[in-house]
Regions:
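Beta-strand/loop-rich accessory regions of lumenal/periplasmic or secreted enzymes
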Residues: 2-282
Length: 282
């Protein structure tokens, strides 16, 4: 790390932009929103919409008994409000940007506080850690805890080391074996009659999202030796899946929606059986 390339940190107060520039990449933050809005590597834009904390999933058939409290608290429409934003040079070739947000639905009390720390290295690597603090004691079990971002649609190929090739969740994964898998983003979508949460891959240690030439983003769990994460990559948002009643109603976006979950709630079988076990609830 001591041999990292130098980084330039520039702030345009008039445009409310903080930029971190390396030898072949630029990362931009909106200082009013406290969000990463651009990540350009070798002239290629990797971000279509800023990464944000995400706590909602499109309800499955098994979620019909818990979806009401999810929506009562507005988990499907949470918006971040910036509380604090700062940038610091940790050492030569290493810059850390920290943003504190509170998430709430419109005209509702704040539900969750997040502290996101982006550590940017001179070689182009970015380390993201997010701390979550609930602000309401009465919160229902959450569907997921993670980050969601949109990337350009050209990045439509997925390769991962984790459970596959079929979808897997904390309590539904025995038939999905650990290995290396490749498929298109379109092929990760499970076309249930009623659109809903689908296509997750549990216990993932690393996954790459690339274009036809193999250029893209590699996501790695820092705790890969001990625990993985769950991810989905779709051409639909959770809200689109929730609102559609049948598959033909879905119109694919031109971008790829990526969800990376530290934890994903269990699926259970509560459409006609028991809800998820306590150990699979968040």
């Amino acid at each position: 790390i001591s041999d990292m390339e130098a980084l330039n940190v520039l702030e345009d107060e008039e445009e409310s932009i903080l930029s971190v520039e390396g030898a072949d990449f630029d990362v931009w933050f909106d200082t009013r929103l406290g969000e990463m809005i651009s990540w350009v590597v070798d002239g290629n834009e990797l971000i279509e919409r800023a990464p944000r904390a995400n706590f909602f999933r499109a309800p499955t058939d098994n979620d019909k008994h818990v979806m009401e409290p999810w929506k009562k608290f507005g988990l499907d429409r949470l918006l971040p409000k910036l509380r604090d934003f700062k940038a610091e040079t940790v050492r030569p070739g290493c810059v850390r940007v920290t943003a504190t947000h509170v998430y709430s639905a419109c005209n509702r009390l704040p539900l969750i506080e997040t502290v996101a720390k982006w550590t940017i290295f001179g070689n182009g690597d970015i380390r993201l850690s997010v701390d979550y603090t609930p602000l309401r004691e009465s919160l229902p079990p959450l569907p997921r805890m993670g980050v969601q971002l949109h990337v350009p649609g050209a990045y439509d190929r997925v390769e991962w080391y984790g459970r596959g090739p079929i979808e897997s969740y904390p309590d539904i994964r025995a038939a999905a074996y650990i290995g290396t898998y490749r498929m298109t983003v379109d092929d990760t979508h499970e076309p249930y009659v009623r659109p809903q949460e689908n296509g997750a891959h549990a216990d993932t240690r690393a996954f790459a999202l690339t274009d036809a030439l193999g250029f893209g983003i590699l996501f790695i769990s820092e705790k890969a030796a001990d625990e993985g994460f769950s991810f989905t990559a779709h051409n639909y948002t959770d809200q689109m899946l929730d609102e559609a009643k049948h598959q033909p109603e879905l119109e694919a976006l031109e971008e790829t929606v990526v969800s990376i979950d530290w934890r994903h709630g269990g699926i259970g079988s509560n459409s006609c059986g028991p809800e998820p076990q306590e150990k699979y609830k968040l």
